[in-house]
């Protein structure tokens, strides 16, 4: 698992992926996104070389681009992942602790969160917090929907759930 973070600039994805390609790496699941003024990459890759050789090849590129990286050997293989069966959207007035409260309630209702994205919109005097979650409803949709209804009522947010059917092919 390769994790990189640094100030956003053009060419990060191209240069990092080029290093991995040159090492005969096969990329699997990846998340690459800009957060604030930073860019972050988390990706799985199968690379035939030893971990220290990968670090040696990545370091000059990371130094040049101002990136920090962390590399871990993991057991999971490429293309061995769980697909989400539900998408949840929560939005309302920005309030401290909403992510902790929402994810606690959803976890207790059996949701295994696979992806969570959030943003703050609106205006400085009335910010709106928006959260989108994809996951697996381990205890079923009804249990999850009940938890969302309680959350919406208690925290005065809009909480919506949509079952999804994802196909990877």
What are these regions (language model features)?
Residues 1-169:
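A conserved regulatory-domain signal marking ACT and ACT-like small-molecule sensing domains
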């Amino acid at each position: 698992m390769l994790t990189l973070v640094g100030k956003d600039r053009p060419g990060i994805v191209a240069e990092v992926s080029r290093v991995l390609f040159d090492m005969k790496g096969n990329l699997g699941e990846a998340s690459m996104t800009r957060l604030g003024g930073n860019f972050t990459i988390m990706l799985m890759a199968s690379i035939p070389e030893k971990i220290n050789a990968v670090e040696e090849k990545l370091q000059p590129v990371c130094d040049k681009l101002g990136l920090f990286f962390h590399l871990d050997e993991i057991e999971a293989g490429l293309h061995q992942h769980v697909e989400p069966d539900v998408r949840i959207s929560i939005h309302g007035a920005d309030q401290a602790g909403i992510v902790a409260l929402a994810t606690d309630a959803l976890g207790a209702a059996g949701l295994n969160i696979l992806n969570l994205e959030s943003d703050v919109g609106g205006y400085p005097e009335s910010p709106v917090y928006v959260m989108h979650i994809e996951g697996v409803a381990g205890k079923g949709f009804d249990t999850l929907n009940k938890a969302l209804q309680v959350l919406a009522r208690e925290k005065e947010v809009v909480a919506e759930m949509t079952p999804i059917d994802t196909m990877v092919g």
